[in-house]
UniProtKB/Swiss-Prot annotation:
Belongs to the LeuD family. LeuD type 1 subfamily. This is 3-isopropylmalate dehydratase small subunit. There is a cross-link at residue 154 (Isoglutamyl lysine isopeptide (Lys-Gln) (interchain with Q-Cter in protein Pup)). Disulfide bonds: none annotated. One of its GO terms (molecular function) is 3-isopropylmalate dehydratase activity. Catalyzes the isomerization between 2-isopropylmalate and 3-isopropylmalate, via the formation of 2-isopropylmaleate. The lineage of its organism: Bacteria, Bacillati, Actinomycetota, Actinomycetes, Mycobacteriales. Pathway: Amino-acid biosynthesis; L-leucine biosynthesis; L-leucine from 3-methyl-2-oxobutanoate: step 2/4. Its EC number is 4.2.1.33. Heterodimer of LeuC and LeuD. It comes from Mycobacterium tuberculosis (strain ATCC 25618 / H37Rv). It is an enzyme of class 4 (lyase). Keywords: Amino-acid biosynthesis, Branched-chain amino acid biosynthesis, Isopeptide bond, Leucine biosynthesis, Lyase, Ubl conjugation.
Length: 198
């Protein structure tokens, strides 16, 4: 996973609340066994509407999604995060995230930045007044910058650390490789053990 420090991109106003993972990517698109190729399923139920925000320029090139409260609720679906990232999003800003979505985002390299709902409303207003407005998310300082506006955001320390270090689950496990090998080496011969790679 690539480390995340700062990201700047076009802000996309998604003026919807309670966007669950089935709305982010419907189940019919979950048939792949890889982590890529889900961008076509992103918001598929809404993208058939020509007036949907991702069908409008310059928002179709956006990488910072500004969503209403309760974004990513519903079933545990890593594909929701993968679809957002495959489309090009690197940051999602909301006043409240589904817990599982927030965890999946941090594990995959997507920044889920939690701000006050008043700040979401302000960002929507700024974006709609200046389509193409660049928004910058600085994870180290935990601030969002849009034009002259600077807003703090919340993220749990563990997720922030993983993003800053670029650590997915495999990379975290590999950091403990010496301990794992020592444990395996100390196990009694009759206990199950992992085999070395060929």
């Amino acid at each position: 996973m690539e480390a995340f420090h700062t990201h700047s991109g076009i802000g996309v106003p998604l003026r919807r609340s309670n966007v669950d993972t089935d709305q982010i990517i419907p189940a019919v698109f979950l048939k792949r066994v890889t982590r890529t190729g889900f961008e076509d399923g992103l918001f598929a139920g809404w993208r058939s509407d020509p007036a949907f925000v991702l069908n409008l320029s310059p928002f179709d090139r956006g990488s910072v999604l500004v969503a209403g409260p309760d974004f990513g609720t519903g079933s545990s679906r890593e594909h929701a995060v993968w679809a957002l990232m495959d489309y090009g999003f690197r940051v999602v800003i909301s006043s409240r995230f589904g817990d599982i979505f927030r965890g999946n985002a941090g594990k995959a390299g997507l920044l889920a930045a939690e701000v006050a709902q008043d700040d979401v409303e302000l960002l929507w207003k700024l974006i709609e007044q200046s389509p193409g407005l660049e928004i910058t998310a600085n994870l180290q300082d935990r601030i969002i910058t849009a034009a002259t506006v600077v807003l703090p955001f919340k993220i749990d320390d563990h997720s922030a650390w993983r993003l800053l270090e670029g650590l997915d689950d495999i990379a975290l496990t590999l950091r403990k490789l010496d301990e794992i090998e020592a444990f395996e080496g100390a196990c009694a011969y009759w206990k199950p053990r992992t085999l070395p790679a060929p």
